[in-house]
Amino acid sequence: MHKLVLIRHGESTWNLENRFTGWTDVDLTPTGIEQAKTAGRLLKAEGYEFDLAFTSVLKRATRTLWHVLDEMDRTWLPVEHSWRLNERHYGALQGLNKADMAKQYGDAQVLVWRRSYDTPPPALEAGDPRSERGDIRYAGLDPEQIPLTECLKDTVARVLPFWNERIAPAMRSGQRVMVAAHGNSIRALVKYLDGISDDDIVGLNIPNGIPLVYELDDDLKPLRHYYLGDAEAAAKAAAAVASQGKA
């Protein structure tokens, strides 16, 4: 049996301000730092060990991983960063307040933008200063690989190659793996692992900073999954994520 630990970054500054974040590189809040440290202490107390960790190129995920590994006294662990684990790109919504958008466009429209499988938000213009196409961390990519907006379907399309080419082979070789990423890149992985339908994925919300454990068979098919720690607290945190896009 293999175990895979997924963890969404701790609360970010734009989570706190209820803004669409996407690829914008915002930092953790003090609460987010403490969430990450708590996760690390919990993983250590439960006896988890890792051989390799994967994360995105956005600081809220990378710093979450730092704090987790620091609490586990495993800061030497090999870490691989990939843009493919970045959050879903929210296009022209990036930086805007979710509740304000709900007041302007209605809760239903914002829910579609936030959670539907195949409907992207309005795209950024290529020359918009919010676009990441001039960011040095993506210098090795073709401009067309850097999105101007994404739906979850698009996020799945960029996350799954990384699963197939890096995460799954590492696990099959016997390595114990943790992935510190984002709400929608984790939703993409969960959708794939659990075979969640395009319609049902709308209802899945990933809470900040709580380790999600998957137990997988030799073919990396899920046997079960669960949040570490207080299950009721995890459910409440997921419900709070769901309510962010309401007026």
Swiss-Prot record:
Catalytic activity from the UniProt record: (2R)-2-phosphoglycerate = (2R)-3-phosphoglycerate
Database matches in CDD domains: HP_PGM_like (cd07067)
Broad enzyme group: isomerase
Site (Transition state stabilizer): H182
Residues of the active site: H9 (tele-phosphohistidine intermediate), E87 (proton donor/acceptor)
Pfam families xref list: His_Phos_1
Pathway(s) per entry: Carbohydrate degradation; glycolysis; pyruvate from D-glyceraldehyde 3-phosphate: step 3/5
Isomerase in keyword set: yes
Record-annotated disulphide pairs: none
Enzyme Commission (EC) number: 5.4.2.11
Claim: Isomerase is one of the keywords in the record: yes
UniProt GO BP: gluconeogenesis; glycolytic process
Gene Ontology molecular function, alphabetical: phosphoglycerate mutase activity
Listed InterPro entries: His_Pase_superF_clade-1 (IPR013078), His_PPase_superfam (IPR029033), PG/BPGM_mutase_AS (IPR001345), Phosphogly_mut1 (IPR005952)
Residues bound to substrate: 8-15, 21-22, 60, 87-90, 98, 114-115, 183-184
Highest taxon listed in the record's lineage: Bacteria
Keywords recorded for this protein, A-Z: Gluconeogenesis, Glycolysis, Isomerase
SUPFAM superfamilies hit by this protein: Phosphoglycerate mutase-like
Stretch forming the signal peptide: none
SMART domains: PGAM
HAMAP family: PGAM_GpmA (MF_01039)
Family matches, as PANTHER family: PHOSPHOGLYCERATE MUTASE (PTHR11931)
Primary role: Catalyzes the interconversion of 2-phosphoglycerate and 3-phosphoglycerate.
Oligomeric and partner information: Homodimer.
UniProt name for this protein: 2,3-bisphosphoglycerate-dependent phosphoglycerate mutase
